[in-house]
């Protein structure tokens, strides 16, 4: 359900919706989480789990995560990388209202360098031409946002989070 009016009690003349007395409480707008991975479930090694699940199981888990997110007060999320675009099914169902969940903007496959952070499920792209092609592929697949793995990360064994993974030229091509 959506909030259709917020006003002092005396200003609801003629209003036909449900009225909720929030006296003594605090009303917050929906929260936004700008970095989630719906297909992950908080485990230390998401790669092993995802490699052992079938696509339908991954989608159902992502739906459950989306619904948990909404119940926690987060009404909009940005999913920054999933598995084989499976999170797009969750995004489309939630955004269309067919399923209960937050508003979702999804990146699709993370764009990463060979051997870099996210390379197991990401779209590997080395050099400016490959980065440009990878960005175009994500747009064609229906991505709302693009995620470029500019540095290493903590979830990929043997990768230093402080290391640069793309040159300035590669990043410019990916952003332009």
PLM segments and residue spans:
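Histidine/acidic residue-rich metal-binding segments in metalloenzymes
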Residues: 89, 129-176
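Metal-associated gating/positioning segment near the N- to mid-region
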Residues: 25-96, 169, 173
């Amino acid at each position: 359900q959506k909030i259709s009016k917020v006003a002092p009690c005396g200003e609801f003349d003629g209003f036909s919706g449900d009225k909720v007395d929030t006296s003594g409480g605090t009303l917050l707008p929906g929260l936004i989480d700008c970095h989630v991975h719906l297909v992950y479930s908080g485990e230390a090694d998401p790669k092993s789990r995802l490699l052992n699940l079938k696509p339908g199981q991954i989608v159902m888990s992502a739906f459950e995560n989306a619904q948990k997110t909404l119940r926690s007060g987060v009404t909009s999320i940005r999913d920054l990388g999933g598995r084989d675009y499976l999170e797009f099914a969750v995004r489309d169902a939630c955004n269309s209202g067919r399923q209960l969940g937050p508003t979702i903007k999804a990146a699709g496959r993370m764009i990463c360098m060979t051997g870099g952070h996210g390379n197991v499920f990401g779209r590997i792209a080395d050099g400016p031409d490959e980065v440009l092609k990878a960005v175009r592929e994500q747009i064609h697949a229906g991505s709302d946002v693009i995620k470029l793995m500019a540095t290493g990360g903590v979830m990929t064994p043997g990768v230093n989070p402080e290391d640069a993974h793309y040159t300035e030229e590669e990043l410019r091509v990916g952003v332009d």
